[in-house]
């Protein structure tokens, strides 16, 4: 739900566009599943909820197993044989699980690791091959996939603007700047250096103070994100504020990055000052640049940032 | 326990001047093919790498009391401590691990885990390269070609096992068995009281030829109700290799002759099994006494024999074949 839509216009100003480098990474390979481990792994699946079981694993007198969560729901009756459950533990299966090693569930996405059963979930929650969540903030979008899929998803399903280039110049216009409480979101995707970057712009309450924030997220993993640096700049009427930092991986959620204040934060009074005029309308022009860390940028005079707060 | 000790006079190539005309001259062909391919010492390093999973799961399938492998039904207490069926019957409903009441609880999960387990043969260190499902492992191990051999000495309940060179030394040093080299033999068996057949007696001689070892057995036993003497040959090695050889045993006297020709049995087959299958030269007591001559008061049998390899074309020359009159 957008009230007073923010208009994003790219102007051909004196910003010098660098040409982009295109590099494509390919991941391949799949792990062969060890068949004895597979059938033992099936034994570790709760017959009721089909989730993996973890200690304490329960069983009935006949040996039918059950996870702790389901045991508390079945009212002391075995779901398999209807016998009384009692309070019997299947210690043997817990020990079998200790000695079990299994491939990561993302092995078909390229992960070659094999992990002890009791470490598998932890690894999978941070596996570099796990699919990415949709970076579109606002709607609770549950889409997941690889970067290529998500870029198409952002373009086709969320109608996000797509741009190519390492520099950008955005104008954000809002007719009623007082309504900061209702956070609004603006997302633009940039393609440069063969990668994709998400530029976020939004308004939110920082403590009790209304602020606007712009920040960049890298569509990929944290390790790759660290190869890049970006700057964001806003100003007007003799004032300028610049943020320079490293893009955050989309592995970190939008809210996490926002709440860590990792980006350009503009207090509302300064935003109105930058907008000029009669302080009735928000007009911000945010310019920015993305570069690779290994390169030595030797262009332009660096104007020291005068930050008035 | 020897009653009226049987005197075995082993004379190689001895010809007695009796009226029996020995037409065939014995071949003293001692061909020593030293095949050093004893399978028992051929340790195949091809025992495939064990999954850490397999080893530690296998330990879970060991009964904590008797340390034998457990098979269904596997029992447990409320706390999950497992126990085999045999030990459960002995522990009077008290868990040996935590002293809690056992009850009647089955560890079905561990039984199913065992189904999916594959383990190397326990004779892996003796050369067996194979891996088997848990529930098939014991069966294989009883027939594995790499399993150690039992002592072929019959009579005493000798429980010694080992490979063939070890057992040959054991027979010579511990059982004082006569050792001979050569492919032909000529044995005299003398017993002063031939009536006592009920108490079986045993005589064992080991022959070394073709680079292999053969056990010649001679004994007396009741065949049904009839007292008989029997001589047979066993090969110190496996059945498949024993089939490469043939042997003959011959006994006779006074115009009669009995000849047995056959294939040696592997020492994998026990002495009793071979005897009870009648696979050898069987002499009824009345014929044995006839062959012994004299006043039928004393047993005097001369058994001659020969071992040859099947692949060889043994052109047996000479001698009229006298049909066996029984």
From Swiss-Prot, chain A:
Pathway(s): Protein modification; protein ubiquitination
Keywords: Cytoplasm, Metal-binding, Nucleus, Transferase, Ubl conjugation pathway, Zinc, Zinc-finger
Domain notes: The RING-type zinc finger domain is essential for ubiquitin ligase activity.
Tissue: Expressed at low level in the vascular tissue of mature roots. Expressed in lateral roots and in elongation zone of the main root upon stimulation by auxin. Colocalizes with NAC021/NAC022.
Binding site for Zn(2+) 2: 134, 141, 153, 158
Cellular component annotations (GO), alphabetically ordered: cytoplasm; nucleus
Residues noted as binding Zn(2+) 1 in the record, renumbered to the chain: 104, 111, 123, 127
GO BP: any one term: ubiquitin-dependent protein catabolic process
Protein name: E3 ubiquitin-protein ligase SINAT5
Effect of residue 49 to S: Abolishes ubiquitination in vitro; acts as a dominant-negative mutant
Cysteine disulfide links: none
Region called SBD, residue ranges: 96-289
Primary residence: nucleus
Induction info: By auxin. Induced by salt stress.
Catalytic activity: S-ubiquitinyl-[E2 ubiquitin-conjugating enzyme]-L-cysteine + [acceptor protein]-L-lysine = [E2 ubiquitin-conjugating enzyme]-L-cysteine + N(6)-ubiquitinyl-[acceptor protein]-L-lysine
Subcellular location field: Nucleus; Cytoplasm
Gene behind this protein: SINAT5
GO molecular function: transferase activity; zinc ion binding
Family the UniProt entry places it in: Belongs to the SINA (Seven in absentia) family.
Gene3D superfamilies linked to this entry: Apoptosis, Tumor Necrosis Factor Receptor Associated Protein 2, Chain A, Zinc/RING finger domain, C3HC4 (zinc finger)
Transmembrane portions of the chain: none
Record has Cytoplasm as a keyword: yes
Stated role: E3 ubiquitin-protein ligase that mediates ubiquitination and subsequent proteasomal degradation of target proteins. E3 ubiquitin ligases accept ubiquitin from an E2 ubiquitin-conjugating enzyme in the form of a thioester and then directly transfers the ubiquitin to targeted substrates. Mediates the ubiquitination and proteasomal-dependent degradation of NAC021/NAC022, a transcription activator that functions downstream of the auxin signals, thereby acting as a down-regulator of auxin signals. Involved in the formation of lateral roots.
Curated annotation (Swiss-Prot), chain B:
Expression induction: Induced by drought stress, salt stress, osmotic shock and abscisic acid (ABA).
First-listed, main subcellular location of the protein, grouped into a coarse class: other
Region entry Disordered, spans: 1-44
Keyword Transferase: yes
CDD domains listed in its UniProt record: RING-HC_SIAHs, Sina
Cellular component terms per the entry's GO annotation: autophagosome; endomembrane system; multivesicular body
Domain comment in the entry: The RING-type zinc finger domain is essential for ubiquitin ligase activity.
Protein name: E3 ubiquitin-protein ligase SINAT3
Upper lineage: Eukaryota, Viridiplantae, Streptophyta, Embryophyta, Tracheophyta
